[in-house]
Amino acid sequence: MREIKSFEKWVKKSLKEHFIFKPYEEFFIVSDGYVGFKILNKCKDYRKVIEEQTFQDLKEDFKIYNRKIEKIGIADIQKEFDISNKEKAIKMPFVYDNIYKARIFKNKENLIFVDDNFLKNIDLYNYDIYAGDPVHPLVFYSKDISYITLPIRMCNFEYEIKEIQGELKCN
């Protein structure tokens, strides 16, 4: 129930700026350009939220940008949710807080920083996490709903994470 309320808040916020809806045969995808949801059609509550907020029948794709509605065209958002070319990642028990408050994820030797605000839309503990490299979207995967978010790109960013007396300090 908490996730559907978070989703509804996200939809309302996205409609003010940028919102994309793309239906497929077994699922649909919604995105605001920074995060996205891939939701099976059997999850009718999520579909109902979108219908109520957009006043659309959800049979065709559309985007809303600056409160204007248009047809998308041939954009294939589905490939971003593909986990076959990504490795399983883990959530590190640290938060990086310099300019952004960011969560840290790790796959292989890569640390991937994600804006904490992008993670408020889901309960992380309900998902398996997959990541490629630090510049491609992370996929939070469950059998009914998958979620993607863009990482904070930190090229040549040198960081050192230290835990001092139970407190995390980042230099």
Q: Where would I find each of the regions flagged by the language model?
A:
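C-terminal functional regions that serve as terminal interaction/effector modules
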Residues: D32-G36, L40-N41, K48-N171
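Intrinsically disordered, low-complexity linker/loop segments enriched in Gly/Pro
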Residues: M1-E25, I29-I39
